[in-house]
Amino acid sequence: TPVEEEKVACILEAARVAPSAANLQPTRLVVIDNAEGMEKLSRAANVYSAPLAIIVCADHAKAWKRPADGKSTVDIDASIATDHMMMEATSLGLGSVWICWFDPEVVAHEFGLPETFEPINVLAIGYSDEPAKSPDRHATERIPVGELLACH
């Protein structure tokens, strides 16, 4: 089942308003919603038969770097945008999968990405064949807050 254009627009808006270091907004998105594009993407990643995928890229030309050590925050910025899109997709009744196991060189080649763009992750989105999992599962599937805290 295709994802409705209105829902795609809401998901993209969630990425657009995501915060970024120094508000430089280095995240760039490649939206794939057709069979040809999904076939190209499947050469680099398992997209789980999703009807929609978003390649989340970081434009290194717009990177903010921490002065103390030069750490670029583009991966972080792209990840924040991805998380915002996932939460929006969930709120719209969609399922999503954050994919990091892919070949970035194949993605860059297949989609003609500019030299300064690095594909950070792929977000596959669609209607799940399975019912949504209960948030109650976090009580057993996630570490307790006490383990999460490094110092307390």
Annotate each language-model stretch with its function.
Residues T1-E6:
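A short beta-loop-alpha structural element at the N-terminal edge
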Residues K7-A81:
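Glycine/small-residue-rich phosphate/adenosyl-binding loop
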Residues A50-I54, G112-S134:
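A glycine-rich helix N-cap at a beta->alpha junction
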Residues A58, W101, Y127:
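Short secondary-structure boundary segments
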Residues D69, V122-H152:
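C-terminal helix-cap and adjacent tail motif
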Residues A81-T90:
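Acidic, metal-associated active-site segment
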Residues G93:
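Structured binding elements
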Residues I99-T116:
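Active-site helix/loop module of the DD-peptidase/beta-lactamase fold
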